[in-house]
Design a protein with these regions (language model features):
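Sec-dependent N-terminal signal peptides
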Residues: 4-13
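Glycine/tyrosine- and acidic-biased, solvent-exposed loop/turn segments at the edges of beta-strands
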Residues: 14-117
């Protein structure tokens, strides 16, 4: 009997935790839809905009579980374009995109101004 009670209470705890998850937030602004997605811990995961056809447009930013930026860049009608930035523990990469293809990469680390070009 104790085993069934413990199993039931564990299931209820998991169900309550799942209900605490933040649902994505969408806001319509004219022809664009702003979107905010969340990690399981409630921190923002991604922010950006879609057009009415569902294509990614404008700036998109991604964050880790602690709220630190992982990447930021620009989409034109669903295609990566221009400069994108990717952060990791000790490096920053600047990646130039044209039609979603990488055309240049510059990498910085904590010890030098430009590590790779």
């Amino acid at each position: 009997m104790k085993i069934y009670l413990i199993a039931a209470l564990s299931f209820i705890g998991v169900t309550v935790s799942a209900q605490d998850l933040k649902s994505p937030l969408f806001q319509v602004d004219g022809e664009l839809i702003s979107a905010t997605y969340y990690h399981e811990n409630g921190e923002v995961s991604q922010k950006g905009t879609f057009n009415k056809d569902g294509a990614l447009v404008g700036f998109w930013t991604s964050y880790d579980n602690n709220g630190n930026k992982l990447s930021q860049g620009y989409y034109e009608n669903g295609i990566k374009s221009g400069k994108w930035f990717f952060w990791s523990e000790d490096t920053l990469k600047e990646v130039d995109f044209q039609d979603s293809k990488i055309i240049n990469v510059i990498e910085w680390d904590e010890k030098s101004e430009v590590a790779l070009k």
